[in-house]
Each structure stands twice: as structure tokens, then as C-alpha cells.
Amino acid sequence: MKIFGLFLLIATYMALAFAGEDVCIPSGQKCGPYMNMGCCKGLVCMSYAARCVSMGGIPRMHI
């Protein structure tokens, strides 16, 4: 079952790559140095979570 999932993931990325559009990783999805695309505009890849997140939504503690 894992092999089928991996095949489906690779096929999806290949289809998106051949579509000719600018492909990016949306918020909440996995990212990292092994990915061949970056997070969408306004998002950053947090290394400890390996996910694309928005920097504007970080809650701050009020003391």
C-alpha cells in the first residue's frame, strides 16, 4: 500500500511539473530540502515541523 501511495505522489508531482504552471506547497503541507519546490508566497518552511506555515499567524504571549 505504501508503494502505491508513493507512486501516486510522484505521478501527481510529475503532472503538475508538466502543466507549466508555477507550483508551490500550500500551508500545512510537508516541505524540506528534499522537495523540488518551495512554499507558496507568504509562507515559510519551518525546519522543526517540516511544514509550510504563515509567519503572520504566530501568537504572542502578553506579559
UniProtKB/Swiss-Prot annotation:
UniProt feature coiled coil, ranges: none
Domain of life assignment: Eukaryota
Keywords for this protein: Calcium channel impairing toxin, Disulfide bond, Ion channel impairing toxin, Knottin, Neurotoxin, Secreted, Signal, Toxin, Voltage-gated calcium channel impairing toxin
Main location (coarse class): secreted
GO molecular function, one term: calcium channel regulator activity
One Gene Ontology cellular component: extracellular region
Leader sequence segment: 1-19
Disulfide bond sites: C24-C40, C31-C45, C39-C52
Localization, UniProt: Secreted
Tissue specificity of this protein: Expressed by the venom gland.
Family: Belongs to the venom Ptu1-like knottin family.
UniProt remark on domains: The presence of a 'disulfide through disulfide knot' structurally defines this protein as a knottin.
Function, in words: Binds reversibly and blocks P/Q-type voltage-gated calcium channels (Cav).
Protein name: U-reduvitoxin-Pr4a
Organism of this sequence: Platymeris rhadamanthus (Red spot assassin bug)
Lineage of producing organism: Eukaryota, Metazoa, Ecdysozoa, Arthropoda, Hexapoda
